[in-house]
A protein has these predicted regions:
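Functionally constrained cores in energy, signaling, and assembly domains
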Residues: 13-16, 57, 71
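A short, surface-exposed interaction/processing loop segment used at functional sites
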Residues: 64-82
Length: 82
């Protein structure tokens, strides 16, 4: 399941991302930040060490045997003190 999520993200980079900006991305370039499986469904949050700031959410619907990819770009990271 996690390998499938990595493959989906790597394929997105290689098919959709700007080919001038990023060289070929493999599953080894993608890491899982968080993963959860409930019954036949699962969700994974993934990223890479690439400087583009992309973050991904892959959701798998086991009833429909379909995966969905959401791609996000980090806009800002600010410190908030207590």
């Amino acid at each position: 399941m996690q390998e499938k999520a990595k493959q989906i993200v790597a394929n997105w980079y290689n098919d959709e991302a700007g080919k001038d900006e990023i060289s070929a991305v493999t599953e080894e370039d993608v890491y899982v930040v968080w993963f959860c499986k409930t019954l036949q469904n699962w969700k994974a949050l993934l990223s890479t060490d690439l400087p583009d700031g992309m973050y991904f959410e892959v959701t798998y619907n086991g009833d429909k045997k379909e995966a969905y990819l959401d791609a996000y770009r980090k806009i800002k990271n600010v410190k908030i003190s207590d």
